[in-house]
């Protein structure tokens, strides 16, 4: 199975740029076209939060329009820029959206790789938090299929990254997730967003990772007190290839017009 992950789209109202600089709609158009041109088509896409910038209905409508050229299942979770009720309405035609209660949490059993979605959002806050009820649900859900390879998807990564201003709006209680993941070795990866960069950490006997944005990236500055900046580094997304013999292998894909490809001989 080939699973595509995109994250932190930050779609604005039609014709508006994010932070007055970033044409996020055009960025997503290029990303969708790039995914559509892959020599091997993904089997599904997960979008790990911050689908839109302001949580408005018209932003979600534009998002659905931009994703429409992709003829494959798309599964989404909220980020801190999303608004749950507007997001539910925008994806009301998707059966998985009806699984959760207050939070947008669900499980997908339609693929060789099981997908379990967690909601880390605190409304109107940049940082996130895991609910005790979510941890109980996750533990029980993972226990139902101990032999099925699984990815857990969530917006805020459950670890500090060293990028101070992002860690300040990180996951407040990520440590409560680690023993749950450790109890279920079928979890191949915890796939996250929020950081607008590709970052990995060993976590609960598995790997937790973040995905770059198809739009703008967070400036990599590990100094204490570094300013809050973004940079127009090459946009990207990730491909996660699952095979029974090889397990889960992840690739970060850059979006752009680059020279080549050239033969090695």
Describe each region flagged by the PLM.
Residues 11-15, 53-58, 80-88, 123-126, ...:
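Active-site environment of divalent metal-dependent phosphoester hydrolases
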Residues 57-144, 176, 182-186, 212, ...:
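Extended active-site neighborhood of metal-dependent phosphoesterases/phosphodiesterases
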Residues 30-44, 127-207, 238-239, 246-248, ...:
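His/acidic metal-ligating clusters that form di-metal
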């Amino acid at each position: 199975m080939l699973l595509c992950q995109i994250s932190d789209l930050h779609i604005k109202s039609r014709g508006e740029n994010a932070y007055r600089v970033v044409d996020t709609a055009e960025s997503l158009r290029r990303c969708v076209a790039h995914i559509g041109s892959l020599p091997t088509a993904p089997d599904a896409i997960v979008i790990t939060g911050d689908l839109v910038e302001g949580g408005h209905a018209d932003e979600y409508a534009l998002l659905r329009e931009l994703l429409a050229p992709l003829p494959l299942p798309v599964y989404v979770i909220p980020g801190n820029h999303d608004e749950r009720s507007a997001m539910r309405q925008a994806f009301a035609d998707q059966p998985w959206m009806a699984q959760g209660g207050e939070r947008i949490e669900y499980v997908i059993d339609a693929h060789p790789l099981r997908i379990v979605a967690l909601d880390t959002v605190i409304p109107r806050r940049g940082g996130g938090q895991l609910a005790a009820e979510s941890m109980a649900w996750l533990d029980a859900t993972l226990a139902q299929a101990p032999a099925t390879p699984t990815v857990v998807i969530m917006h805020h990564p459950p670890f500090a990254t060293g990028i101070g201003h992002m860690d300040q709006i990180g996951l407040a209680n990520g440590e409560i997730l680690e023993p749950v993941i450790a109890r279920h070795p079928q979890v191949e990866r915890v796939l996250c967003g929020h950081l607008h960069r590709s970052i990995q950490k060993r976590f609960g006997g598995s790997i937790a990772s973040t995905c770059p944005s198809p739009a703008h990236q967070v400036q990599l500055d590990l100094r204490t007190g570094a300013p809050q900046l973004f940079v127009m580094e090459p946009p990207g997304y990730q491909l996660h290839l699952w095979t029974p013999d090889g397990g889960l292998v992840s690739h970060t894909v850059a979006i752009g017009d680059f020279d080549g490809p050239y033969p090695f001989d």
